[in-house]
Amino acid sequence: MGPAFTFNGYSREAFAKIIDAGYADAVFAGNALATHDLEGAYFHTSLGQDIDTQENRPNGHYHHLDTINRVRYWGSIERFIEEEGVRDGIMNALVRNGVPYVLAGSIRDDGPLPCVLGNAYDAQDAMRSHLRKATMLHTIATGNMTPSYRVLADGTIRPVYFYCVDIAEFAVNKLVDRGSLASRGIVTNVQDFIANIAKGLGLWVRR
C-alpha cells in the first residue's frame, strides 16, 4: 500500500472498514503510509491538507514531522495510538484487530517511524513470512516473491490470484513483464478503488 490511501478521508476509512471486517491478513507498506495515516488521526490532515476538504492547513507541511516525533516519543505506533487516544484510521484498525503489518524503509523517508525496517533484506524476509499464507498480493516487489500456487490443508493445490492496482499503466505492466504472469493489472485511482471494494463487500463508506 502506498500513502495515497490516506490522502482522502473516504479511502482511509474504507480500508479501515475492510480490515475491521476481517478481509486483511497482513499489510505491506512503507513509512509514508503509516506516517500520513497517523497524521490523519492526529491532525486530520495528510501532507498538510485536510483529509476531507483537501484544503491546506497553516504550517500543515510540518504535521507529518510532528506526528513522527510524537510516535518516536512514545516509542511505538501501538503506544502512540493508546496514549494519544487515536480512534480511527488504517494503523488503528490494524493494531486493534491484531493484523500484522510490515513497514519497509526508503532513502526518501522522513523520520522514520520506530518500527520501520530500514534494511531491505529484513523487510523482504518479514514479507515472505506472511506471503506463504497470502492469497491477494500487491506491488512489484511482492509479486516477484509470490509463489504461483499454494497447497491447502487437505492437499488440494490451488493457484494464487493477485491484482496490482496503480494509477500508472507502467507499474501494472512492469509486474507482468518481470515474470508475475498470473498478475492482473487494474489502472485506476486507488482511493476510488478501495472505496468501491468496501461498498462491494457491503461495508458502509461515507462519501
Predicted regions and their residues:
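General beta-strand structural signal in soluble alpha/beta enzymes
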Residues: M1, F7, V27-G30, Y101-G105, ...
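Metabolite-binding pocket within alpha/beta catalytic cores that recognizes anionic/polar moieties
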Residues: M1-W74, V187
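C-terminal functional extensions of proteins
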Residues: I51, E55-V99, S106-R207
